[in-house]
């Protein structure tokens, strides 16, 4: 074992100087190679620099070209924008002019429409007036024709009115005849009481009725106003109001109003003569008028004059 170790050591000792020499040789060779490579590498470096510079120049040229193109495009775009703005301005001005022209046209159209409406209304009014005038002319012609035909009608009416006038005259003349008949009957009854007793009760009642009718006719015709050919209903109400105001203000009534009041206030008609029965058998003919003031005065409370001075507890 010892021998083997020794041999290994000897071999290692012998091998050590050789490796050093080899390393020295290798370092020298490397230096030589590096120097030669440097000699050869110098033109390559220069070439690379030239290529880099050339590339840079190319890039600069490309950039300048791109800038020129961008400038050209910008100029074209600005020109296009200017043209578009000019066109827009021209279109706006033209549209404004058109709108300004259109606004008066619209107003003119409205005015024309209004004038047309007014003309239509005036035409309709004229047509209506023309129709109305035609109707008036027809009515006037009809009236004229009726006026030409009226004389015959007036004559007929006068013929019809003549008997009525005669009747009115006879009615105004009748009271005296009736009064004469009543006086004659009273004289006969007063002079011939025996004959009146011999007459039957039926005949007496008929005579009494005739006398009563004659008296009523005489009274009615005394107070009956004159008959007029025309009747005015609006004159009736003022007459009633005047009569009521006379009663309310306690003015003395005329004889005609008293007779009319007696005649209208009778609750039952008078059938028999005044001398046939005693006075208590007849109904009263005069009625007392009651005014609203007299009725209201009855309900006023009676109070002494010193009521204001007295204290109410």
From Swiss-Prot:
Protein name: Alpha-S1-casein
Keyword Secreted attached: yes
Keyword Cytoplasm: no
Signal peptide: 1-15
Source organism per UniProt: Mus musculus (Mouse)
GO CC annotation: extracellular region
Disordered as annotated region, ranges: 77-111
Residue spans of the Sequence repeats: 135-140, 141-146, 147-152, 153-158, 159-164, 165-170, 171-176, 177-182, 183-188, 189-194, 195-200, 201-206, 207-212, 213-218, 219-224
Keywords carried by this UniProt record: Milk protein, Phosphoprotein, Repeat, Secreted, Signal
Positions of modified residues (Phosphoserine): 90-91, 93-96
Skewed-composition ranges (Low complexity): 77-96
Family per similarity comment: Belongs to the alpha-casein family.
15 X 6 AA tandem repeats: annotated span: 135-224
Coiled-coil annotated residue ranges, if any: none
Tissue expression profile of the protein: Mammary gland specific. Secreted in milk.
Described function: Important role in the capacity of milk to transport calcium phosphate.
Localization per record: Secreted
InterPro entries: Alpha-s1_casein, Casein, Casein_CS
